[in-house]
Amino acid sequence: MISAKCFTQEWVEEKSIELGIRDKNLIEKVIHAFSLLDLLAQSGCPFHFKGGTSLMLILGKATNRLSIDIDIMCPPGTQIEQYLNNLSQNGFLRYEMVERKQAGKNVPKSHSKFFYQVAYKGAKDVESFILLDVLYEDCHYEQVQEVEIDSSFITTEGKKHLVKVPSVGDILGDKLTAFAPETTGVPYFKKGKSSSLEIIKQLYDIGRLFERVDDLAITARAFKSIAEIELGYRGLPLDVSIIYDDIRNTALNLSLRGFIDQDKFALLQDGINRFKPFVYNTSYYIENAIVDASKAAYLATLLKHKVMKVEKYSGDLSSLPDMATVNDWPNKLNKLKKLNPEAYFYWVKAFTVV
């Protein structure tokens, strides 16, 4: 169980100094996210842990980003409410079910808010909350592993609990379907509000997962399985190629800084700016996002053409072909050769897969 001292002002301030994170609100949210995960692990709830916070366990410190929600997958018919006991022992005051179904779509989800008393401000009556998103589906991951709930943000007392998480290859396939705002991914707007921050979170995660894969066999199967389910929920044709194109087009618009669609680029740029507090021990600017976009486009192209080997940038561009002879190559990408050579490398690879 997570130690009660993790919910104190002293602990939050200690972690702020230790990890170099100014936003104590985010630190406290991360701590409570892990506490909710620990509660679920103790409860016997049948679930697989997915989403951004799961990467803090799968990738460890390599993720360098804060995630403050819990996303899980439960078998259809699971009554999640029966597992939400012992809230006070896990640092929570209460929870509220927000909705059982996503408006306008047939996605079998539930959303709950878990409220806790804010410690870092030293105020007794200030509350905040974290979200639990539950997707009611059978597990579609090919490889699942059990990992301990362990992080530099928390300390535990007694035995550390285990949770089931997807492999790097599986969750990369999942994340790629989420970085497709016009089809299966996080849309530009939800209920009239910009979701660009969530889009950039998917992009950032793809960039970190990219470094852990050399073969896309597992990713390809996970992508196809998840993509077909998501297309079905949205009433779209069961043609995964529209997702590949969506990923590439979104990535290209970002890399060309809005040359294709200035309004959508402005949204993505705003998402990058709002994402900055969520990374630590590193920085994340438009140039970093362009590199990650080039990786996403390259991966989408490899999957589309059923090429499983991933080539990685070594710092050498001398082996790349002359792009003047390549059909459909956007000449504006040539600027990246000097300004952002890593992004240029992956864009060349994306346009020369076949």
Task: Give the predicted meaning of each segment.
Residues 19-22, 71-78, 192-193:
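Short histidine-centered catalytic/ligand-binding loop motif
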Residues 37-70, 74-76:
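Active-site nucleotide-donor binding segment shared across nucleotidyl transfer reactions
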